[in-house]
Amino acid sequence: MRIGMGYDVHKLVENRDLILGGVKIPYEKGLLGHSDADVLLHAIMDSLLGAAALGDIGKHFPDTDPKYKGADSIKLLEFVGELLNKNNYKISNIDATIIAQRPKMAPHIPTMRENIAKALNIDLDQINVKATTEEGLGFTGSGEGISSQSICLLVK
């Protein structure tokens, strides 16, 4: 068994879509990044890659490579799932947290879980997503950005 941890953060800006867990969430701001800036999927990918000792998303999808400009993170997650399979790793479970003051995530979490399970070809009960605020503290609490953390367990 191998445990992996992932973390990602992006700044909220105007004129960008807010995409988390592959879900476009109605909001006046979106996350700034080279790809679609889906912090939830980025944290999940880093936890999976870390558990398998396969580097991180910066290694596999560098922001200096124009082919990842505006990339759909669900497609990147599918690639990570294939990479795990190729290296004989199976996902036992993933537990992830979105940290954002606004907007409310609860209505979107079921679809996020479905998207992640489908992309990784795992059962829905193997992926948990939850959300919390930081009670107005720090950059997430002030609405400057959104972060996400993920932990996973892999078996070989």
Swiss-Prot record:
Annotated keywords: Isoprene biosynthesis, Lyase, Metal-binding
Biological processes per GO annotation: isopentenyl diphosphate biosynthetic process, methylerythritol 4-phosphate pathway; terpenoid biosynthetic process
Binding positions for 4-CDP-2-C-methyl-D-erythritol 2-phosphate per the UniProt entry: 8-10, 34-35, 56-58, 61-65, 100-106, 132-135, 139
Record keyword Lyase present: yes
Co-factor note (free text): Binds 1 divalent metal cation per subunit.
Pathway noted in the entry: Isoprenoid biosynthesis; isopentenyl diphosphate biosynthesis via DXP pathway; isopentenyl diphosphate from 1-deoxy-D-xylulose 5-phosphate: step 4/6
Subunit architecture: Homotrimer.
Function: Involved in the biosynthesis of isopentenyl diphosphate (IPP) and dimethylallyl diphosphate (DMAPP), two major building blocks of isoprenoid compounds. Catalyzes the conversion of 4-diphosphocytidyl-2-C-methyl-D-erythritol 2-phosphate (CDP-ME2P) to 2-C-methyl-D-erythritol 2,4-cyclodiphosphate (ME-CPP) with a corresponding release of cytidine 5-monophosphate (CMP).
Name under which the protein is recorded: 2-C-methyl-D-erythritol 2,4-cyclodiphosphate synthase
Upper lineage: Bacteria, Bacillati, Bacillota, Clostridia, Eubacteriales
